[in-house]
UniProtKB/Swiss-Prot annotation:
<keyword id="KW-0732">Signal</keyword>
<keyword id="KW-0378">Hydrolase</keyword>
<feature type="signal peptide">
    <location>
        <begin position="1"/>
        <end position="24"/>
    </location>
</feature>
<dbReference type="GO" id="GO:0061809">
    <property type="term" value="F:NAD+ nucleosidase activity, cyclic ADP-ribose generating"/>
</dbReference>
<feature type="disulfide bond">
    <location>
        <begin position="39"/>
        <end position="58"/>
    </location>
</feature>
<protein>
    <recommendedName>
        <fullName>ADP-ribosyl cyclase/cyclic ADP-ribose hydrolase</fullName>
        <ecNumber>3.2.2.-</ecNumber>
        <ecNumber>3.2.2.6</ecNumber>
        <ecNumber>2.4.99.20</ecNumber>
    </recommendedName>
</protein>
<keyword id="KW-0278">Fertilization</keyword>
<dbReference type="GO" id="GO:0016740">
    <property type="term" value="F:transferase activity"/>
</dbReference>
<comment type="function">
    <text>Synthesizes cyclic ADP-ribose (cADPR), a second messenger for calcium mobilization from endoplasmic reticulum. Might make the Ca(2+) mobilizer nicotinate-adenine dinucleotide phosphate. Does not have cADPR hydrolase activity.</text>
</comment>
<dbReference type="GO" id="GO:0016849">
    <property type="term" value="F:phosphorus-oxygen lyase activity"/>
</dbReference>
<feature type="disulfide bond">
    <location>
        <begin position="75"/>
        <end position="155"/>
    </location>
</feature>
<comment type="similarity">
    <text>Belongs to the ADP-ribosyl cyclase family.</text>
</comment>
<keyword id="KW-0968">Cytoplasmic vesicle</keyword>
<dbReference type="GO" id="GO:0005886">
    <property type="term" value="C:plasma membrane"/>
</dbReference>
<keyword id="KW-0106">Calcium</keyword>
<dbReference type="GO" id="GO:0007338">
    <property type="term" value="P:single fertilization"/>
</dbReference>
<dbReference type="Pfam" id="PF02267">
    <property type="entry name" value="Rib_hydrolayse"/>
</dbReference>
Length: 282
């Protein structure tokens, strides 16, 4: 998804923006109140005409969520730990609107436009409630650590990705029709598509036969060198993987709608001036 990347360490020092481990060691204060507040906000005001409400109430969801990691050693989790929570929080996703991202958190969410154009994992109830929060369990009362969480690199991969890995898998499994995947084609250090990314590990493998096509949007950052293009490098690898799964595949670089979004913040960039002449923008 889809997709700055998502890691929940059961040490659970994580955020959906996939910040570095050393930055995510202090648990979110008042975790229960934040969870319940976001849940109620979502229930009453968020995505009302776009995504359905879930049957479980907010306190039942909290109980199920807390049970998954509380009174356990920080790294004593696996990819099944949050299974019951995600079953309770599951939503039907609109056809042809599911979007994944890798390395382009801000751009992807600006483009998705709060669900009006596309749905991201962070627009779903679980993603909305837990986005950017940090938590971890402990064996003693009150069952979770309120002062510090261990660096997630100290946990096994199945533990540190137990929440967001399951979130990504569940989200992808609910997708139908055409799905969209936005990637960064200007990062010299990280390929646009990586098999070990959350998209590569959890989202792409969990797409079902209800999906018809994977549509890739390659974003080239303004003023930066173009590293990856459709049909070459890691994007060719992705195309082969997608077609092997019998899905259709499309790839486009900086479509007009994305370019205009980038240029809104930097209208004087060379690419924006060229686009202005090409598209005859006043």
């Amino acid at each position: 998804m889809s997709p700055v990347a998502i890691v929940a360490c059961v040490c659970l020092a994580v955020t959906l923006t996939r910040i570095s481990p050393s930055e995510a060691i202090f648990p979110t204060p008042e975790l229960q109140n934040v969870f319940l507040g976001r849940c109620k906000d979502y229930e009453i005001t968020r995505y009302l005409t776009i995504l359905p409400r879930v049957k479980s109430d907010c306190r039942a969801l909290w109980t199920n969520f807390f049970k998954a990691f509380s009174f356990k050693a920080p790294c004593n989790l696996d990819l099944g730990s949050y299974k019951d929570f995600f079953q309770r929080a599951q939503q039907t996703l609109p056809k042809n609107k599911v979007m994944f991202w890798s390395g382009v958190y801000d751009e992807a969410h600006d483009f998705a436009d709060d669900g009006r154009k596309y749905i991201t994992l962070e627009d779903t109830l679980p993603g909305y409630m837990l986005n950017s929060l940090v938590w971890c369990g402990q064996r003693d009362k009150p069952g979770f650590n309120q002062k510090v969480c261990p660096d997630f690199k100290d946990c096994p991969v199945q533990a540190r990705e137990s929440f967001w890995g399951t979130a990504s898998s569940s989200y992808a499994h609910s997708a139908e029709g055409d799905v969209t995947y936005m990637v960064d084609g200007s990062n010299p250090k990280v390929p646009a598509y990586r098999p070990d990314s959350f998209f590569g590990k959890y989202e792409l493998p969990n797409l079902t036969n209800k999906v018809t096509k994977v549509k890739v949007i390659v974003l080239h950052q303004l003023g930066q060198k173009i590293i990856e293009r459709c049909g070459a490098g890691s994007l060719l690898d992705l195309e082969m993987v997608v077609k092997a799964k019998k899905f259709g595949f499309d790839c486009v670089e900086n479509p007009k709608s994305v370019l205009f979004l980038l240029c809104a913040d930097n209208p004087n960039a060379r690419e924006c001036q060229l686009a202005k002449r090409y598209y005859r923008i006043a």
